[in-house]
């Protein structure tokens, strides 16, 4: 079992796989036609120079509506160029219409199509190969290996085609402990968790779960890992864990079973642990509607990161492996960015000043050797100084919508201390006095509805009438979709919704009760997000990512290991205070209060039962140590905990989970949280998808 996940290698594995496939297809020069949704991911893995040096690719063009017009010029300049299509249909389950159109219009004699799929396990591939041989298939024919749902669409063409899989692993783009599968949105930019059409939700959820299971399975087999403890929160999360367990069991070999029995047998126990925690977005629909206050979060709210972790309107590359300044600043509260940039500028100036002290040839050589890295660091520092200044200008302008007033209103809604009439007056003020964008107004109204566990009938009708009168009758369709998804409901509508969507996990309590039980709005740290701190200062509570609020998602994960919050705020009758393994015992009543279903949370153990007697030892006696191979130093051994988000994760939640890891570490629970999510989410994306 591997407990050291080198996630940085996943990027290299993906890049090498694509290059090998492109070299396999042809030795002629190639034109790579890339589906637009795939391009940002491709750019994260390879530069154009890397691609042209390692493969026969000489040109790249987009698989868009202009392709049919651009093809003659792309192919005509160089003789004998092969056309290679790169597509991803894992969520849409259909070929891009532009590919079919180009093939028919230009009568392409042979189609070479590379399609994305999650990397299968070696065992699975071996078993499939043996079965194909038994069934008499030609192993050199790629056509028989392709999913039927896509192959049937290709058969409509008279063109010959050859299909090549690009086996992928989720890879780090934001942080080495954050892996995004980019399956939350399909190629039409439909949100698979919150589809605009309610009738599609069952189908899109199934696709989303299947894709996440495939990605998790690829990671588990690639790293040779064994999952020991699993906790699922939410009905969709339980579906995901059940399906993953089934597929892992189906593809286990006798060798796998022998290894697991040796490590976790009746008489022996290796003590290694790997947790899997799965949460779906509806377990906490409130956090994405809040304004984010970390550097990365506020950039996502203002400019929106794409799947290549680049933002609109700004020509910047946020590469955490190259840009150390971005890596240091991304999860800090924005209020501390200025002092940090000032500190980094002084350190850089000090390093430049060492050239005046260089006297010997050796000292001069050392400075010259470091000059390249200093200049690169200076460029990064300049970029982030300019960007943070731009952000500051935007949030300080009234045209943006009174940034501080929105933060204050969010906190008032969460604390439940303000009457609905007062909140409605503030919303009207934001609309007419500050001319706030309607998506932000709608986000605040949805936040109010969720925190009140739906609105009184008269408040609902008042706000609904206000929005229709202000924004037009066509807004009715979006409000209907928001109601069906539980974002904007009346007390009566909430009851009807609960009857028709009994399988969905939804909050059933007003947020003021939730905040009391989980202490999500700590009074002592109410204004912590406004404090100016440096990188050595830690917030005692995780209120730095949002305005005085701790996300419910963090508290749900925290209670699995640390019951101190529930002990002080919900019930003093807790089975433990600290636990190395995630445990849900005696949370059933709390979960039923939250979601109306005590079975919305589920715990399971995927190794022999004796492990619970061995692993659940006192935290104080947990003196496990591991060695860092890079420098030979020892440090506390960390158990890997895979935290999976179905339906998207916010930049703020990522920062909060890293904070929780530190909190648990100080208490002797050494975990390495690796976040795996199907995509990034925030209030703007939700409002855009439900339109």
UniProtKB/Swiss-Prot annotation:
It is found in: Vacuole. One of its GO terms (cellular component) is fungal-type vacuole membrane. It comes from the Eukaryota. Keywords: Phosphoprotein, Protein transport, Transport, Vacuole. One of its GO terms (biological process) is piecemeal microautophagy of the nucleus. The modification Phosphoserine is found at residue 626. Coiled coil: none annotated. One of its GO terms (molecular function) is ATP binding. Signal peptide: none annotated. Belongs to the STXBP/unc-18/SEC1 family. Component of the HOPS complex which is composed of PEP5, VPS16, PEP3, VPS33, VPS39 and VPS41. HOPS associates with phosphoinositides and the PX domain of VAM7. Interacts with IVY1 and VAM7. Essential for vacuolar biogenesis, maturation and function. Involved in the sorting of vacuolar proteins from the Golgi apparatus and their targeting to the vacuole. Acts as a component of the HOPS complex that acts during the docking stage of vacuole fusion. HOPS is an effector for the vacuolar Rab GTPase YPT7 and is required for vacuolar SNARE complex assembly. It remains bound to SNARE complexes after vacuole fusion. Present with 830 molecules/cell in log phase SD medium. This is Vacuolar protein sorting-associated protein 33. The gene is VPS33.
């Amino acid at each position: 079992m591997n407990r050291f996940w080198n996630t940085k290698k996943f990027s290299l594995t993906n890049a090498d796989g694509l290059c090998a496939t492109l070299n396999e297809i042809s030795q002629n020069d190639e034109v790579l036609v890339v589906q637009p949704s795939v391009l940002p991911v491709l750019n994260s893995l390879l530069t154009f120079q890397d691609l042209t040096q390692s493969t026969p690719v000489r040109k790249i063009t987009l698989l868009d509506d202009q392709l049919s017009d651009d093809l003659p010029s792309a192919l005509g300049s160089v003789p004998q160029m092969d056309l290679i299509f790169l597509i991803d249909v894992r969520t849409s389950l259909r070929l891009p219409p532009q590919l079919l159109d180009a093939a028919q219009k230009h009568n392409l004699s042979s189609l070479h199509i590379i399609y994305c799929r999650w990397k299968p396990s070696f065992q699975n591939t071996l078993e499939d190969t043996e079965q194909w041989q038994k069934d008499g298939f030609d192993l050199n024919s790629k056509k028989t290996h392709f999913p039927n749902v896509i192959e049937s669409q290709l058969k409509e063409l008279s063109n010959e085609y050859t299909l090549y899989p690009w086996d992928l692993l989720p890879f780090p783009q934001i942080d080495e402990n954050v892996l995004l599968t980019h399956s939350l949105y399909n190629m039409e930019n439909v949100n698979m968790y919150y589809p605009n059409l309610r009738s599609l939700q069952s189908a899109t959820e199934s696709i989303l779960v299947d894709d996440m299971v495939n990605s998790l399975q690829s990671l588990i087999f690639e790293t040779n890992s064994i999952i020991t403890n699993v906790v699922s929160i939410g009905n969709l999360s339980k579906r995901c864990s059940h399906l993953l367990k089934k597929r892992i069991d189906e593809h286990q070999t006798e060798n796998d079973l022998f290894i697991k029995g040796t490590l976790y047998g009746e008489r022996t126990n290796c003590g290694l642990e790997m947790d899997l925690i799965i949460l779906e977005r509806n377990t906490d629909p409130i956090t994405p509607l809040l304004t984010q206050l970390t550097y990365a979060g506020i950039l996502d709210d203002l400019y929106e990161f794409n799947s290549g972790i680049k933002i609109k309107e700004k020509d910047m590359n946020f590469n955490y492996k190259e840009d150390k300044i971005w890596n240091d600043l991304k999860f800090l509260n924005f209020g501390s960015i200025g002092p940090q940039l000032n500190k980094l500028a002084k350190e850089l100036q000090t390093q430049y000043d060492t050239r005046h002290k260089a006297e010997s040839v050796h000292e001069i050589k050392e400075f010259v050797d470091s000059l390249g890295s200093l200049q690169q660091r200076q460029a990064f520092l300049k970029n982030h100084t300019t960007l943070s200044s731009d952000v500051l200008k935007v949030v300080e302008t009234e045209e943006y919508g009174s940034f501080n007033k929105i933060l204050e209103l969010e906190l008032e809604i969460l604390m439940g201390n303000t009457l609905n009439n007062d909140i409605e007056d503030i919303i009207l003020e934001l609309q007419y006095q500050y001319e706030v964008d309607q998506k932000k107004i709608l986000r605040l109204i949805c936040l109010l509805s969720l925190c009140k566990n739906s609105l009184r009938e008269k408040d609902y009708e008042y706000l609904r009438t206000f929005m229709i009168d202000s924004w037009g009758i066509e807004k009715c369709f979006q409000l209907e979709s928001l109601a069906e998804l539980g974002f904007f409901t009346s007390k009566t509508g909430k009851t009807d919704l609960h009857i028709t969507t009994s399988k969905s996990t939804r909050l059933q309590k007003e947020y003021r009760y939730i905040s009391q039980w989980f202490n999500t709005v700590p009074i002592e740290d109410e204004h912590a997000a406004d404090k100016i701190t440096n990188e050595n200062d830690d917030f005692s509570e995780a209120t730095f990512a949002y305005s005085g609020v701790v996300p419910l998602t963090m508290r749900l994960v925290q209670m699995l290991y640390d019951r101190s919050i529930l002990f002080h705020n919900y019930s003093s009758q807790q089975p433990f205070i600290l636990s190395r393994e995630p445990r849900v015992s005696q949370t059933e009543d709390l979960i039923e209060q939250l979601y109306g279903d005590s079975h919305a949370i589920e715990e399971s153990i995927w190794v022999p039962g004796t492990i619970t007697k061995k692993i659940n030892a006192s935290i104080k006696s947990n003196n496990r140590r591991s060695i860092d191979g890079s420098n030979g130093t020892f440090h506390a051994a960390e158990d890997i905990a895979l935290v999976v988000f179905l339906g998207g994760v916010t930049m703020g939640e990522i920062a909060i989970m890293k904070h929780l890891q530190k909190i648990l570490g100080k208490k002797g629970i050494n975990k390495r949280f690796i976040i795996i999510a199907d995509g990034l989410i925030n209030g703007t994306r939700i409002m855009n998808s439900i339109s």
